[in-house]
């Protein structure tokens, strides 16, 4: 990655004119392709600072009217230079509707400032759903502001001779995703406390979305990105949508997302609720407990589906320790792990009305972390023959899985 360089303009005045031209052109293209994005914001700013602090809005609709879309408009040429003409050597993520590159841009468009490392998502021109998701991310991430939601710096929208070009520019997340650390092919193991802290941050991000009456719809370990301090940030908002209004209990929508994480009521009926996200959160809680993916086809039949498998090892049973990630080498608090499994079980209730709100989940996680800090561990090692067999199967090499979406990770 040391080959990255930045193209600096020798004519600052000309560059400023070009930037202003790109800004006007980008806004015009958005007005033509998605007028709902620009009607809610009269200006797109080059300022990369977080939006000004405002009273807590009632919903995301209030944000659309109260805040400007604080986004920078890039030219295609600028982003092409930032990535060495979209070099394959700089690819950090790839999925069905686009590719993510690592690049460097001028900070605030000023060549005198140090370059800014970013993640650039380039939409696949053949992607049927990609353009709609691109618009959704520009619309949503242009106005939200939370430490546990990835920051969108800007976008590019050009219709040129080479065809339609749609790109998004995000802050760069140097520690990739929770998935990359939880299911590694190397020896590194994510410590127990760090797993809890990451899930707490992710829960606070979801709570923020739910306060805005936004349903994330795609919570999974690969969408929880980690910065250089391992602070978690939710990413990929192409599937997010506004929740129900008034007396409505749900919104009905096409069933999309990732198999294994979606709530049963959504899969069966297409009815989407805020607590559909809570279910997905429960799935990831079991992923951090077990160190297993929600679906692993290389396991014995009885163990291929994570949620079916863990039912055989209830949190209150003596056999529970058999499902805890063996890579932790017993360096986790026994009571804390059981409490976390019980919280996951609440999140996974079939009846969504019985699931806790994300606000309650946050409080429970804080309590579990506090109790875990006061508990002595490593816990006693299980030495039964059955436990050894389970653990040997757990450390088997995971199957290679392709990404369904594109994450902003490096």
Swiss-Prot record:
Carrying Phosphoserine, the residues are 222
Which chemical reaction does it catalyze? L-seryl-[protein] + ATP = O-phospho-L-seryl-[protein] + ADP + H(+); L-threonyl-[protein] + ATP = O-phospho-L-threonyl-[protein] + ADP + H(+)
UniProt: ATP binding residues? 92-100, 121
Q: Which family does it belong to?
A: Belongs to the protein kinase superfamily. Ser/Thr protein kinase family.
**Phosphotyrosine, modified sites:** 170, 266
Q: Where is this region: Disordered?
A: 11-59, 373-410
Q: What organism, scientifically named, is this protein from?
A: Arabidopsis thaliana
The source's superkingdom equals Eukaryota
What is the top EC class of this enzyme, as a single word?
Answer: transferase
Main location class: membrane
Q: What induces it?
A: Induced by infection with the bacterial pathogen Pseudomonas syringae pv maculicola strain ES4326.
Query: What PROSITE patterns would the database entry show?
Result: PROTEIN_KINASE_ATP, PROTEIN_KINASE_DOM, PROTEIN_KINASE_ST
Set out the biological process GO terms recorded for this chain's protein: innate immune response
User: Where, per the database record, does this protein carry Phosphothreonine?
Assistant: 253, 258
> How does this chain sit within the bilayer?
Lipid-anchor
Q: Identify the catalytic residues.
A: 218
**Could you tell me the gene encoding this protein?**
PBL19
Q: What GO molecular functions are on record for this protein?
A: ATP binding; protein serine kinase activity; protein serine/threonine kinase activity
- In this chain, composition skew of type Polar residues spans 30-53
Enumerate the Pfam families for this protein: PK_Tyr_Ser-Thr
The record's GO CC annotations read: plasma membrane; plastid
Q: Which UniProt keywords apply?
A: ATP-binding, Cell membrane, Kinase, Lipoprotein, Membrane, Nucleotide-binding, Palmitate, Phosphoprotein, Plant defense, Serine/threonine-protein kinase, Transferase
UniProt name for this protein: Probable serine/threonine-protein kinase PBL19
EC number, UniProt record? 2.7.11.1
Query: Which residue numbers delimit the Protein kinase domain?
Result: 86-369
């Amino acid at each position: 990655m040391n080959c990255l360089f930045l193209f600096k303009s020798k004519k600052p005045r000309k560059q400023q004119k070009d930037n202003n031209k790109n800004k006007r052109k980008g806004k015009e293209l958005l007005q033509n392709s998605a007028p709902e994005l620009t009607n809610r914001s009269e200006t797109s700013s080059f300022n990369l600072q977080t939006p000004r602090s405002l009273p807590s809005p009632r919903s995301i609709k209030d944000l659309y009217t109260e805040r400007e879309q604080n986004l920078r408009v890039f030219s295609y040429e600028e982003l092409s230079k930032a990535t060495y003409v979209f070099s394959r050597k700089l690819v950090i993520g790839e999925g069905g509707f686009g590719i993510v590159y690592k690049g460097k841009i001028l900070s605030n468009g000023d060549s005198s400032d140090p370059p800014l490392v970013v993640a650039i998502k380039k939409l696949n021109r053949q992607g049927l759903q990609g353009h709609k998701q691109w618009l959704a991310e520009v619309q949503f991430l242009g106005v939200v502001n939370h430490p546990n939601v990835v920051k969108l710096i800007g976008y590019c929208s050009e219709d040129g001779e080479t065809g339609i070009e749609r790109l998004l520019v995000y802050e760069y997340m140097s520690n990739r995703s929770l998935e990359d650390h939880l299911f590694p092919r190397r020896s590194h193991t994510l410590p127990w406390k760090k797993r809890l802290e990451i899930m707490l941050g992710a829960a606070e991000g979801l709570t923020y979305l739910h306060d805005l009456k936004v349903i994330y719809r795609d919570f999974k370990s690969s969408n929880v990105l980690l910065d250089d301090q391992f602070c978690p940030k939710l990413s990929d908002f192409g599937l997010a949508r506004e929740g129900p209004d008034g007396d409505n209990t749900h919104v009905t929508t096409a069933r999309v997302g990732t198999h294994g994480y979606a709530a049963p009521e959504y899969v069966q009926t297409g009815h989407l609720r805020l607590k559909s996200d809570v279910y997905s959160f429960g799935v990831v809680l079991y992923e951090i407990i077990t160190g297993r993916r929600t679906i692993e086809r290389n396991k014995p039949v009885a163990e291929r589906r994570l949620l079916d498998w863990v039912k055989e090892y209830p949190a209150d049973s003596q056999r529970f320790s058999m499902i805890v990630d063996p890579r932790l080498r017993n360096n986790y608090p026994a009571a804390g792990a059981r409490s976390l499994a019980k919280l996951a079980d609440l999140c996974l209730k079939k009846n969504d009305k019985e699931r806790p709100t994300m606000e309650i989940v946050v409080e429970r996680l804080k309590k579990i972390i506090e109790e875990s800090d006061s508990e002595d561990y490593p816990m006693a090692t299980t030495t039964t023959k059955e436990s050894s067999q389970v653990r040997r199967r757990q450390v088997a090499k995971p199957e290679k899985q392709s990404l369904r979406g594109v994450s902003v990770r490096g």
